[in-house]
């Protein structure tokens, strides 16, 4: 078998773990006559003409290169459908495309992650009538919209006043500036849930303004580790991108080598990172 893994590394600590999981799975498959090639865009933001060109060129290269299957950190493009129609088994990870463009998708359960975030804020915010905000990535990105939907659904059971859902397009500078504007416009803000890896700008804005509020973030990096340890960030919700890469490639192999069925969406269970269990992550 000849397999390909396609990734982007705009947030190296996040995307690198996905690629590491896929590489570890690829090493485990070496004894099964399986070749795995890895393609990654390492030149910055993923919402640029350059990254779009890389995606299209790489998908064409895979289509013309005799590959049997692809596991991709996906962004919507009709080329995924063309790839599948040409006989390549397409699977996506982290972010999905239209279901008819791929065979299965692996991700963490964003809806449940959003519900967890809302419940944590409800438990920890002493003045619950205060408004809360969600710092999201992209309005039309499925994993981001799923977390927002989960948060909104949970507030029907643990009532919170959602004052704002604002978007930063996975750009740390936009996250910082938009959070500064939010804090200035809403002096009573009680909490922010950051539903993407892009938390550094939000954290910087809150630090600079000296505001006391509940911060719940997503995933883990060196900055978040120290923020959780100090209590500045109350908790982070882990989507285990390493396991998405590892399990995603193994599932792709099993589907092709053994004709094993894979459910349409493979869900990874979100985990809560607190100061008390931080050493486990």
Segments predicted by a language model, with ranges:
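Short hydrophobic segments within beta-strands
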Residues: 4-9, 93, 135, 193
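Short, solvent-exposed amphipathic alpha-helices that sit
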Residues: 13-31, 113-117, 142-161, 178, ...
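Hydrophobic alpha-helical
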Residues: 55-57, 65-85, 151, 167-225
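Hydrophobic alpha-helical segments within soluble ligand-binding/sensing domains
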Residues: 105-131, 175-176, 224, 239-257
């Amino acid at each position: 078998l000849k397999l390909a893994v396609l990734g982007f590394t705009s947030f190296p600590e996040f995307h690198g773990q996905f690629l590491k999981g896929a590489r570890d799975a690829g090493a485990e498959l070496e004894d099964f006559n399986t070749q795995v090639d890895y393609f990654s865009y390492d030149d910055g933001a993923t919402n640029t003409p350059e990254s779009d060109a890389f995606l299209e060129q790489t998908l064409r290269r895979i289509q013309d290169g005799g590959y049997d299957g692809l596991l991709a950190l996906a962004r919507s493009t009709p080329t995924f459908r063309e790839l599948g129609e040409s006989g390549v088994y397409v699977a996506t990870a982290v972010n999905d495309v239209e279901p008819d463009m791929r065979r299965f998708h692996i991700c963490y359960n964003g809806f449940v992650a959003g519900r967890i975030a809302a419940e944590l804020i409800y438990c920890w915010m002493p003045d619950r009538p205060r408004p809360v905000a969600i710092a999201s990535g992209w309005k039309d990105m499925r994993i981001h919209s799923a977390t927002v939907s989960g948060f909104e659904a949970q507030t029907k059971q643990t009532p919170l006043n959602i004052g704002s859902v604002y978007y930063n397009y996975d750009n740390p500078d936009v996250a910082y500036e938009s959070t500064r504007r939010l804090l200035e416009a809403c002096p009573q803000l009680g909490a922010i849930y950051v539903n993407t890896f892009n938390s550094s700008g939000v954290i910087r804005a809150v630090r600079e303004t000296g505001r006391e509020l509940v911060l719940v973030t997503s995933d883990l990096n060196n900055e978040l580790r120290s923020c959780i340890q100090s209590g500045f960030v109350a908790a982070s919700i882990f989507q285990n991108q390493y396991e998405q890469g590892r399990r995603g490639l193994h599932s792709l192999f099993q589907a092709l080598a053994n004709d094993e069925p894979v459910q349409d969406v493979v869900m990874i269970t979100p985990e809560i990172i607190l100061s008390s269990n931080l050493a486990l992550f």
